[in-house]
Amino acid sequence: MKLLYIVPKLNNEGGVARVLSLKLNYFVEKFGYEIHVLTQNKGDFPLFYSFNEKIVFHDMILSGKAFYFFNAFRKSLKEKVEAIQPDAIVVCDNGLKAFAIPFILSGEIPIIFECHGSKFVEEKQLKSDLISKIKLSLKYRFKDFSANKFSKVVALSNESLSEWNVNNGLVIPNPCWIQNDISADLKSKKVITVARNSYEKGLDRLLLIWEKVIKKHSDWILEIYGDSITYLQPIVSDLGLGSNVSLNEPVKNISEKYLASSILVMTSRSEGFPMALLEALASGLPCVAYDCPTGPRAIIDNEVNGFLIEDGNVDSFVQKLESLIEDENLRLQMGKNAKESIKKYKIDGIMEQWEELFKGLNCLKV
């Protein structure tokens, strides 16, 4: 089986890059698939995560404004697919150009859309004027129309699938790469979050929450790991959080950081199926997260392995986070439940679902 994955970038430390390193390596090492990856890495190597040396990477060099950018994308895509001749194509791109792929590649090759984010994901705060609202509505209608042109739409949770008005969808969650018997002892006075500094990840919201928390718990530290994280320093300084917030660039030994923490927090405005939550639960950490679209609800069992907070409810978030800070027994019980809840995300069972999907599609005329 020859598979082509289309991904914007893999030369970063994000959750999509993490999960694709797991899955693509598994396809090569366990199933013997031939894997090709088409990216816009712009030749920036080495990759942050480890990919099997048999995986073949192809780079699209795209530039210019909208029309020229899209035309270069269309031309490069057709040339690469013609050269590779894959048995199936998997698109892991939430950008608008990804939804044009079924129209660009109108051939016999099955094309799967693997959705790693909310349909309503936005990279910046939306404008409220009428023209902006009309543009937004048209964009979502185009996404729905295009999604039905894919051979399959694979969502990571039932909640994510319900966002799409499609009749060709199914759910296959992400696997968790941390599978061991070690758990955090939950005695440290550290709260951790792992996220890139972007509008959708909502780290600005987290700092406002943390400002309230340390008024009672000034001996606790919030550790943030992610790219472009230093841009948060002015906010940290303005809020007077310098002694209680540690800003850190991405690290490859992130599992050690989870084990040295007691709680994970997530304040994203939108998600797909956040790997940070899976990793934290696998490390035995209770989690507190906003119930944003989509992902946290599928992973956190409220009041069992963590707390799911009404999106944007700062006071509720502070209250639940403080309850975990103040009650070690509650942390320990939720941490134990967290470890148990991660078992259903073992990689073997999830990858078997992907193999069955590919086998089925190759038996169909598309």
Language-model features: where?
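A short, well-ordered alpha-helix in the C-terminal region of glycosyltransferases
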Residues: 316, 323, 330-344, 353-356
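N-terminal strand-loop element at the rim of the active site
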Residues: 6-13, 26-68, 163, 228-230
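Aromatic "clamp/platform" in nucleotide-sugar-dependent glycosyltransferases that forms part
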Residues: 250, 269
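Conserved acidic donor-binding segment of nucleotide-sugar-dependent glycosyltransferases
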Residues: 301-303, 307-314, 322-329, 343
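A conserved mid-protein helix/loop that constitutes part of the nucleotide-sugar donor-binding site
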Residues: 14-22, 189, 196-212, 315
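Short His-centered aromatic/hydrophobic patch
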Residues: 91-97, 115
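Short hydrophobic beta-strand element within catalytic cores of glycosyltransferases
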Residues: 286-290
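Membrane-proximal helix-turn-helix segments that form the acceptor-binding/catalytic region
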Residues: 132-153
